Amino acid sequence: MLCVMMLLFSAIASFPVSAQAKDQDAGILIIYSTLDGKESSQVKMLDLLAGHFTSHVTVKKDSDVEASDFKGKDHVIYYGQTKRKLSQKLLSLISGVKKPVVAIGYNAGQISQFSGLSLARKENVFQVHSRSEKADVSLESGLNVLSVSGLKGTALYTFKADEGTTHSFIWKTKKGNVYIGLTNLLNDNLIVAKQLREAFGEKAGTTLLYLRLEDISPMSDEKLLLQAGTYLHKRHIPFILAVIPVYLNPETGDKVYLSNQPKMVKVLKKLQSMGGSIIVHGYTHAYRYSETGEGFEFWDAKADQPITSGNAEDPPSILEKEQDFPNEQAYHSYLEPFREKEETYTKQKLTRAIEDLTSSGLYPLAFEAPHYTMSEYGYQIASQYFTSIFGQVQLSSTTWKTSGAPPFVTAPSMLHGMTLYPETIGFVDTSKQNPLGEMEEHISQMIDFEGGVAGGFYHPYLGMKYLPELVDQMERIPDSEWLDLKKTKQTVKTDKVEIHTSGDGTIQVKNGVSPIYEFFDHHRQTPLEKALWILSAVVLLFVIMFVSYTFYLRATLKKRIFKERRSLG
């Protein structure tokens, strides 16, 4: 997946735009053609890529594009995932674009900038030839490509068909327009992406490194956590602490709050002062009664659908499919009450996570969705609380099983203003014969690519067995630097808390959460328990009144006796 994303990036990089810095004033318009008119996972991947170059990305389906969509847009990308006859209106609008256009997949031959383009065949290839490097590049998993012919300009990449003939699949016209012969943007080939970028003259910048200490909950071993954080500190490495404020017992539903674990809080505060940056990794990292660290929290994994109820006692409502409704409007009307429940649930979780951590002296600077799963509406809600998010992104509105990330820091339209720090090298997987094997492969790929983000995570419960080697592997990436989140500009806020960093390494905090509010928030009761507490309060009140009345009678009696004695004396 990373490879195709970088391949696309390389093509887009033919424009005079820095690969490492966004032009905030420039905009990118993505026009897509899909079978059902919806933003597919591939379209969202393209959005993630484009968001690296600008935070002003507009994504429109072909039939909805208007002339106003082109205003303020320096670049236009057309993506044809399916074959379709494009409207004359759309073709006229694209033909009027003065700067180079990128076209991907089908239908590009209808666009004037690619007049004469012919797509002869679709093949799965395992070796391609880079014209710029004059070298063959092997593809481990293969790549589905469209054979290109009929264009004037330069073939950037070619492949050999089974019969031995050579065909091109990526082309640059004489006027600088770029065609990429791919339809599936989720394929995986990093080597091709690196070669393609070089073919377009992209100069690599500094590779950004980051390492998250993952799944830190109130039940984590604080000694192992301190050991890992101290090691990174001694190596002068800033690190990320992905914290879950509440542990949920899957058998009883009981909660263990971080604030009730003083040893863990002390360790986290110490690590925060030693270069660690806290991020919210969910509130419980669980949905219903799944175990903390295993549950999804912001996606119903069992039903594979968005959250429909925040109450663990309620049976899940299985959402109907859009095809079961007469039109799109009827479907959206049906979804509205469920979206309201999802909004309430998500806001409560994020608010409590931020406020619980802040009240313990731990100041979260970003967000990481548990298991990287969340609906796009969930991302929109999260953007009201955070300016940055870590990890990968769920690319489907119907299943959690499709996720991905670009090789760069990005601010796509689907994240509604949040900046994504992508996870690209994975984690230490002890279920494998070589737990570090896949990470080492991904690190090698990032070395070849140059100038991206090499981000991964490590579970502190593994102890120190793999951490030194992992850090050594990451630091072998040349021209790289570690991300210090405190030295970036971040904002995290709720109605009662505001956390800001201005980029100088300091954190400014405004905390309006009272200890009393926090106590009652942590001791929410069932209706029966509330009734018992009310009854207890009433009984206590009567006891207090009885005791007070008893003291009153005794005091009155003493006064009477005193007066009687004085009168007799």
Curated annotation (Swiss-Prot):
Residues 22-530 are extracellular. The chain crosses the membrane at residues 531-551. One of its GO terms (cellular component) is plasma membrane. Residues 1-21 form the signal peptide. The keyword Membrane applies. It comes from the Bacteria. Residues 552-569 are cytoplasmic. Keywords: Cell membrane, Membrane, Signal, Transmembrane, Transmembrane helix. It is found in: Cell membrane. It is a single-pass type I membrane protein. It holds the Pfam family DUF2334. This is Uncharacterized protein YdaL. It comes from Bacillus subtilis (strain 168). The lineage of its organism: Bacteria, Bacillati, Bacillota, Bacilli, Bacillales. The gene is ydaL.
